[in-house]
Curated annotation (Swiss-Prot):
Keywords: Ribonucleoprotein, Ribosomal protein. This is Large ribosomal subunit protein bL17. Part of the 50S ribosomal subunit. Contacts protein L32. Gene3D superfamilies: Ribosomal protein L17. GO terms for biological process: translation. GO terms for molecular function: structural constituent of ribosome. The gene is rplQ. InterPro entries: Ribosomal_bL17, Ribosomal_bL17_CS, Ribosomal_bL17_sf. GO terms for cellular component: cytosolic large ribosomal subunit. Residues 125-195 are annotated as: Disordered. Belongs to the bacterial ribosomal protein bL17 family. Residues 136-152 have a biased composition (Low complexity). Residues 153-173, 183-195 have a biased composition (Acidic residues). Pfam families: Ribosomal_L17.
């Protein structure tokens, strides 16, 4: 039994509304984002999300159900091969509506509807990793602070620190320079062998 849709009918008749939503969904899946009026974007959102849910299941029956609404086989293939698997871990909320400035000609409220391309699981994991890393560095920094306070007491006078630090710095730069020349020589020999 046909049931009426909520809200105002877009386009006048039910057949026009079905065709309008099918064309909007086709454009959305083809381009990833489209600019349309706000009421059309709000009507398209549940329509497109149901189609993406069918694509996530990926069975033949689901493909046929989507083909009833979207007639472009290339777009249906993109939906089932790329968009559906991309949202496999996500339970809804596949689209986002962003309001933009009104249309210049008739001042109609406009919006951009787009597919959400961020992975929420990975962003949450990255955030948790950063929080864990900052918690680990805080105790290490706290442990290093008492050691730094002990070291100046062990040495006698500022002149002893400066004189001992300079020769060590010169030794490290000399050893680094010798390492860099050693690594450069084998590459030159291998270049000579090739030619």
């Amino acid at each position: 039994m046909p049931k009426p849709t909520k809200g105002p009918r877009l386009g006048g008749s039910s057949s026009h509304q079905k065709a309008l939503l099918a064309n909007l969904a086709t454009s959305l899946f083809e381009h990833g984002r489209i600019k349309t009026t706000e009421p059309k974007a709000r009507a398209l959102r549940p329509y497109a999300e149901k189609l993406i849910t069918h694509a996530k299941k990926g069975e033949l029956h689901n493909r046929r159900e989507v083909m009833k609404k979207i007639r472009d086989k290339d777009v249906v293939h993109t939906l089932f091969a790329e968009i559906g698997p991309f949202f496999a871990d996500r339970e809804g909320g596949y689209t986002r509506i962003i309001k933009v400035e009104p249309r210049k000609g008739d001042n109609a409220p406009m919006a951009v509807i787009e597919l959400v391309r961020e992975k929420t699981v990975t962003s949450e994991a990255n955030r948790a990793r950063r929080v864990g890393a900052s918690k680990q560095t805080a105790p290490v920094a706290a442990a290093a602070a008492p050691q730094a306070a002990v070291e100046p007491e062990a040495t006698e006078g500022p002149d002893a620190d400066d004189s001992s630090a300079l020769p060590e710095a010169e030794d490290t730069t000399a050893s680094e320079a010798s390492r860099s020349t050693e690594t450069d020589d084998p590459t030159q020999d291998s270049d000579a062998d090739k030619s």
